């Protein structure tokens, strides 16, 4: 409750990245004029880029019209010739902004605005009357006034505490959602409407507008992010002219998240959009898209909050491999590069993703990376965390992966045989012990001669190690005896040299 009070009462000044020069080479267009064009959104924890020049002063949103919301007739109650004028008047009504922290204050006006927004949504959705260009411009201005705003700071910024686990952190729900939802619905209906001419609409849904939408993805409210995801996806699909810009702008968000903040609420939603975009990539794949995989998607495995967005990230990665199987080696080596060392839950996620990637991997690409891959799998097999060891052993339940292993058993079995023996001899978990025994039997049936050779080499190595250890102990014992004699026959215990 304290967090919500702090969020409601403490809002930091807006500093939109839309008005800053991009540090990743994306030029930004001039802002549109008119109400709402200077309305910006930012998050207090996502300030200006490191070492960037100071941001220009941003104009505040225009104040709403004076007076109260004016009750207006329904569209069906006026002649068709007057509906455009009525549409504009209703848009003006919806430019009033209200304080939703006080549920009683302006209750009548809030309800009038809500009903008006519902009418506007129905009017656009019905397509009963095509709206003019001036009406479209005013509608986008009204939408901008309502949705583009300063986001409340994250809870740890108010309290000074370390950021909590993203999965456990209670999201902040926008109090004005009863109005905000309808504004988003209106924008969505406008974008998807068959009556919307992209040649006209792109004047108002321009690069500046798209950037401000992207800023809003940092909202903690999952309902808002869901609408933003759908709307941006539809904009990407309908406005082909914006596609390269949208991809680059999303890249910028990812770069900042990976290399600077590791804090952003909308990474999962942005990855969902990209998953659909990747699915539509034409073949042969452009170099730009391959670089996106290498420079953005693979490094996204590094941040600590990966558990929040891993499902969407894994889908994007697998889409790339399914589109172009030659990328499998690059992806697998990328996973190995960022493989977690001490985080067992994260390691389980990596093993699950690895299985999906291997399912789409062809033999030639598999052979390129199988040595480092099975060295890592071997380490997972002997993990003291039984869930990690189990998850690694479950790879042998996949027929495609077993087929790849069988084709390259002469290389793979010598790598993992020692780990199989170690599990059988000393792993504390009975389930891991049983699964390891099954895999050992599988290799024995797959190639008895190779299995016996690996067993012989393992036994020889163990015997040699035992011999070396005995020799080491004997050497230390001789040194201890020599030291005792040198000191005049003193007690051996006082002069024992320990290894």
Curated annotation (Swiss-Prot):
Tissues in which the UniProt entry reports expression: Expressed ubiquitously, higher levels in cotyledons and flowers.
Chief location bin: nucleus
Region annotation Disordered: where it falls in the sequence: 1-65
Any one biological process term the GO annotation gives: microsporogenesis
Regions of compositional bias (Basic residues) in chain numbering: 1-13
One Pfam family in the UniProt entry: B56
GO CC annotation: cytoplasm; nucleus; protein phosphatase type 2A complex
Any one GO MF annotation of this record: protein phosphatase regulator activity
Keywords: Brassinosteroid signaling pathway, Cytoplasm, Nucleus
InterPro entries: ARM-like, ARM-type_fold, PP2A_B56
Keyword Cytoplasm found: yes
Subcellular location per the Swiss-Prot or TrEMBL entry: Nucleus; Cytoplasm
Gene3D superfamilies in the record: Leucine-rich Repeat Variant
Keyword Nucleus: yes
Similarity comment: Belongs to the phosphatase 2A regulatory subunit B56 family.
Function: The B regulatory subunit may modulate substrate selectivity and catalytic activity, and may also direct the localization of the catalytic enzyme to a particular subcellular compartment. Required for the formation of the PP2A holoenzyme that positively regulates brassinosteroid signaling by dephosphorylating and activating BZR1.
Subunit structure: PP2A consists of a common heteromeric enzyme, composed of a catalytic subunit (subunits C), a constant regulatory subunit (subunit A), and a variety of regulatory subunits such as subunits B (the R2/B/PR55/B55, R3/B''/PR72/PR130/PR59 and R5/B'/B56 families). Interacts with BZR1. Interacts with BRI1. Interacts with SRK2E/OST1.
Name of the protein: Serine/threonine protein phosphatase 2A 57 kDa regulatory subunit B' beta isoform
Species the sequence originates in: Arabidopsis thaliana (Mouse-ear cress)
